[in-house]
Regions:
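Beta-strand->loop->alpha-helix junctions that form or flank phosphate-binding loops
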Residues: 22-27, 140-141, 147-166, 187, ...
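Phosphate-binding loop of NTP-binding sites
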Residues: 2-149, 201
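Residue-level signal for inorganic ion chemistry
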Residues: 39, 68, 87, 107, ...
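Cofactor-binding loop segments of dinucleotide-utilizing enzymes, especially the Rossmann-like FAD-
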Residues: 42, 68, 264-266, 289-291
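Short, glycine/polar-rich helix-capping loops at beta-to-alpha or helix-loop-helix junctions
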Residues: 7-9, 270-273, 292-295
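Nucleotide phosphate-binding/pyrophosphate-handling subdomain across enzymes
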Residues: 62, 180-284
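Acidic-glycine-rich active-site phosphate/pyrophosphate-binding loop
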Residues: 161-180, 221-227
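Short internal beta-strands
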Residues: 138-141, 262-263, 282-291
Length: 295
């Protein structure tokens, strides 16, 4: 289980006894020939695997989104799929010895889970394990490894895959525009998620028209900048899927008006300095709760 730390004493004793240790992902891979598209990153994993699966299924390419998104990878064995879209966390990658992906994607990397991994360098090392044995390797161009891998980025208003502009497609603060049609988005980070999908679909030779048709019907993630009620002009937005400073920053960028921000949760070894400017500029009242309220 990814919930067990590699430093756990029982785990160490099992390793020393030469007992064979494996993971659910490795078991499933040994039982199926279905191709895996594996996605990791500090933020946006669940939204992106859901979008990839939506696009494929909409185009009669059967797939299931599973893994760290709450749907067991074993669920993928219950039917025949063309692709298994797997969300993989750093905790899962830490234990995996052999991952055989058709396409692997790293969406982004920022400081997170250092209470488990110790250092940022170690965290990056674990995330890069997703590329081992992958046939196609896709990475956000903002990272330092882009020259080694297939890459994607959103630059100004343009979508670029391997530095080539995706024609007829552009992005504004709250819309993606394709052939003069505006597709609302809940934040600029959703444009980056789409760009990662474009890189994947480029490999799979899926036409842009088909991708955008599926994107227009996408299932938005619950609890991700989710407006759940409005009272007397005051909107209540649930972004409890944001579990670090970077994702909170993206959420705040996507919201306008006077903001009352309630934030806090489990204590994590991370800096919140990136939030200072936007909180000073946009947040009317800040309420801090949880274990990390004094951090």
């Amino acid at each position: 289980s990814p919930g067990i730390s590699p430093s756990d004493k029982l785990l160490k004793s099992l390793e020393n006894s030469q007992c064979k240790l494996t993971t659910d992902i490795e078991i499933v891979q040994s039982m199926t020939n279905t191709k895996f598209i594996c996605v990791t990153g500090t933020n946006g994993k669940t939204s992106t695997v859901s979008l990839i699966s939506d696009i494929l299924n909409e185009n009669s390419i059967s797939s299931i989104a599973c893994g760290n998104n709450g749907i067991s990878v074993f669920k993928s064995l219950e039917a025949k799929y063309d692709y298994i879209i797997l969300e993989v966390s750093s905790y899962q990658l830490e234990h995996i010895k052999y991952l055989n992906a058709y396409i692997s994607v790293i969406l982004n990397l920022t400081s997170d889970h250092l209470e488990r991994h110790g250092t940022l360098d170690k965290y990056l090392e674990i995330k890069l394990k997703i590329f081992k044995n992958a046939k196609y390797k896709i990475i956000n161009k903002s990272l330092d490894y882009e020259d080694k891998y297939y890459n994607f980025e959103v630059k100004d208003k343009d979508f670029l895959v391997n530095k080539a502009k995706i024609n007829q497609l552009s992005v504004t603060h709250n819309n993606i525009i394709f052939q003069q049609t505006h597709y609302p988005i809940v934040g600029y980070h959703e444009a980056l998620n789409l760009c990662a999908c474009l890189a994947i679909m480029n490999i799979l030779n899926l036409p842009l028209e088909n991708i955008m048709s599926a994107f227009s019907k996408r299932n938005l993630m619950q609890h991700r900048v989710e407006e759940f009620i409005s009272i007397n002009g005051t909107k209540f937005i649930n972004d409890s899927k944001s579990t670090n400073a970077e994702s909170t920053l993206n959420a705040l960028k996507s919201v306008n008006g006077n903001i009352i921000l309630i934030m806090g949760g489990d204590k994590k070894e991370m800096s919140y300095k990136m939030l200072i400017e936007i909180i000073n500029n946009k947040v009317k009242l800040l309420v801090i709760i949880g274990e990390n309220k004094d951090y």
